[in-house]
């Protein structure tokens, strides 16, 4: 039950990020697209080091984990709506419907691929061998560490796109 509440913090962070960034325009959108993956990276790195540690489950032990989860959601909420708009704007008038429909397809594919990759990383990270508490701790470390690469990649792409846009 507690794990479900913790996972909901990402959704709450996403909502807060979307509300914060909903009224942005111009350069502020560029910043939101860059700050989003930075938040995601910080949250993932936080989870990389916080989750594998033994916790008593007390509120104060969970607060940093809660903040890291909310930070990941905040990052998605800041950047994602503006990225969707960019996809639709980049499509020609004849391809607008196709672009809109493909967004959902890409989201579903990314979710399925991410779940499969998470399972592979967790298993390779020790979830099964050595297993037990030690294996779970080790798997959590590798899982969040490997998945921290995704927002790092997002930062690089956002910076390159911003630099390209400025040079055009």
Predicted regions and their residues:
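12-transmembrane solute porter fold
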Residues: 1-128, 133-165
């Amino acid at each position: 039950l507690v794990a479900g509440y913790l996972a909901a913090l990402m959704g709450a962070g996403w909502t807060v990020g979307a509300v914060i960034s909903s009224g942005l325009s111009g350069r502020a959108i560029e910043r939101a697209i860059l700050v989003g993956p930075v938040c995601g990276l910080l949250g993932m790195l936080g989870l990389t080091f916080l989750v594998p540690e033994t916790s008593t489950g007390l509120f104060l032990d969970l607060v940093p984990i809660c903040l890291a989860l909310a930070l990941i959601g905040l990052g998605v909420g800041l950047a994602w709506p503006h990225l969707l708009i960019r996809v639709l704007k980049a499509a020609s008038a004849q391809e607008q419907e196709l672009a809109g429909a493909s967004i959902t397809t890409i989201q579903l594919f990314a979710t399925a691929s991410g779940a499969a990759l998470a399972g592979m990383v967790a298993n390779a990270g020790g979830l099964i061998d050595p297993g037990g508490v030690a294996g779970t701790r080790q798997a959590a470390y590798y899982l969040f560490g490997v998945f921290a690469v995704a927002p790092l990649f997002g930062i690089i792409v956002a910076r390159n796109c911003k630099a390209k846009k400025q040079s055009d």
